[in-house]
Amino acid sequence: LVSDARRDYFLNQQNGQASTHILDSSTLPAKDLEVRGIVWLPRMMPKAIAKLRGELPPETMYGCGGDRRFFKANNIHPAEFLRATWAYEDEPEKLIDWVTTRRGS
């Protein structure tokens, strides 16, 4: 499912053109940062965008232990978060609202 989201983004948003940019993992927000009381969300958002764009470096894993804790705590599947990130790519507040809603479900 995660690969399907990435493939769909690649074909529909990137028109089949690979990005030449690679995320610098040292620029990711700290692991203990939170927004609206949701730990890891500030870090998760740029990771998901980089995953969608094919810009994650080999040393950075989408779905690592911290990501899995985030997904479990907020009742979200990893592929579902990618699709929501895509839907709200230019509206981070709406993505935060979506996570907040999922957290309560």
Named regions from a protein language model:
Residues 56-99:
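Amphipathic alpha-helical packing elements
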Residues 1-57, 105:
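Polar/charged low-complexity regulatory segments
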